Amino acid sequence: MPISVDGAMRSKIEAVLKGETDRKVESFLIDANREFVTDYTDVYENFLRGLINDDVPTLFHCTAGKDRAGFAAAITLIALGVSKADVINDYMKTNDFTQERIEEIISQIELMSLYQADAEILRPLLGVEQIYIETAFKTAEEQYGSLENFIRVGLNISDADIKKLRNKFLEG
């Protein structure tokens, strides 16, 4: 996903780690999920168009494979007709599959800082919280009336495109 995590985000996270701000790491991810809807519709439109039009397997990811890629997976599932509740449940399974790796990262950060850094502060950055995806969904619903309308209007994906996507990926 060509959505960069800029230096400003890194400096904000460093400020949290150093205790230079009261802002919580979670707030950065809430903001990012809102911005997927408000600022990156072109990226997600291109992503869905690739799924619709390309006849090759698709591998998509981002740094941790949960935020930018998680939203891409979520809107794909919505376009395929999966319920919002099921999409959220699927999104939350990310934590089940990454828990062991998250614990390793927390331990490495603590060790590398000689136990001077409170690596637990970063835990929300390493996993997912329901509020992250719900923020994206709520933003889409507020701006477009529904998630389906966000896909149709916000991402410029026609009913014919959605039908093609469903024919390609669904059986029956």
Which positions does each model-derived feature cover?
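Cys-dependent protein tyrosine phosphatase-like superfamily
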Residues: 1-59, 72-172
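Ser/Thr-glycine-rich phosphate-binding loops at phosphate-binding pockets of nucleotides
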Residues: 64, 68-69
